[in-house]
């Protein structure tokens, strides 16, 4: 999986979980400011990421996820996806 493919999968999960338009989900979109996610939705999103990708996201890591790009970067790190394809 490439980072672009990861972003597309993350986008799909965000659209399904937060019921937002796909166009709204950009790398620099803030979960709370741009996508209007509340704390419960962020927990749901985290659980969806963990389930889909088979990873564990710690509370300290969750606190650092403010944008879609933060989530993609964290997941790519956990999945050992390199930028160089």
UniProtKB/Swiss-Prot annotation:
GO terms for biological process: lipid A biosynthetic process. Keywords: Cytoplasm, Fatty acid biosynthesis, Fatty acid metabolism, Lipid biosynthesis, Lipid metabolism, Phosphopantetheine, Phosphoprotein. Gene3D superfamilies: ACP-like. The modification O-(pantetheine 4'-phosphoryl)serine is found at residue 39. GO terms for cellular component: cytosol; membrane. InterPro entries: ACP, ACP-like_sf, PP-bd_ACP. Its main location: cytoplasm. The keyword Cytoplasm applies. Pathway: Lipid metabolism; fatty acid biosynthesis. GO terms for molecular function: acyl binding; acyl carrier activity. Residues 4-79 form the Carrier domain. Belongs to the acyl carrier protein (ACP) family. This is Acyl carrier protein. It comes from Petrotoga mobilis (strain DSM 10674 / SJ95). The gene is acpP.
């Amino acid at each position: 999986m490439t980072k672009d493919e990861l972003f597309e999968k993350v986008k799909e999960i965000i659209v399904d979980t937060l019921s937002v338009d796909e166009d709204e989900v950009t790398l620099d979109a803030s979960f709370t400011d741009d996508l209007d996610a509340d704390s419960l939705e962020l927990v749901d999103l985290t659980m969806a990421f963990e389930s889909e990708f088979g990873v564990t996201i710690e509370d300290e890591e969750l606190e650092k996820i403010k944008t879609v790009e933060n989530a993609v970067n964290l997941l790519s790190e956990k999945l050992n996806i390199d930028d160089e394809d």
